Amino acid sequence: MQNLYLFITIIKKSDGKEFLDFFLNHKVAPIYSTICHGAATSETLSLLGLERSDKVLMQSIVTTVKMYELKAGLTREMKLDLPDRGIALAVPLTSIASKRIFEHIINEQNNDIPENFVIPERKIEMELIIAICLKGNSDKIMKVAREAGATGGTVVKAKGTASESDMFFGMAISDEKEILYIVSRKEKKSDIMKAIASYTNEHGTHPLTFSLPVTETAGFRLLE
């Protein structure tokens, strides 16, 4: 069966239209976008005299062939390998609920497969760590993650949808949340997650933290 991936791109908000056009030109749709920001601490930003700038997180479902096409295009056309340009990563999916949607993605994206295309052998070397925490806690969690080896992160604003009475380890599910995305090397994942767990247990905050495998990346100059 043709493999599918969640393809995530994080860029500056001011570059959003340019990258959207890139994806549409490469026949990738639909694209789901949300505003986010980098996880630099407020103290660091103040020290450097900077303001927290908005970013855009774009997500779409792509095939194996399209994933490699996008990775090459993002580097060649969009210069994603340049500093502060952005990052991209692919997370493998194990299933998709709708057979019709699955077939639509396959048919739309695999029309122009190169005749000599060979899927490279993949070795999982990166992980996407996701921590869902109460609003205002992402800076503190990112600080301990950095101390454990994380090089950066991205924060997305979110909100729980359960009733106000529902609690999860003392955290009201319906409260405003922050979702922290951290991409790390596989060998550093355990240290980072243990550091987050140790800090949150000590301070009584209990984010939901988990990790996903990352098969391909672009723009990670410090990690690749």
What are these regions (language model features)?
Residues 1-224:
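Positively charged, small/polar-rich N-terminal and surface patches that mediate targeting and assembly
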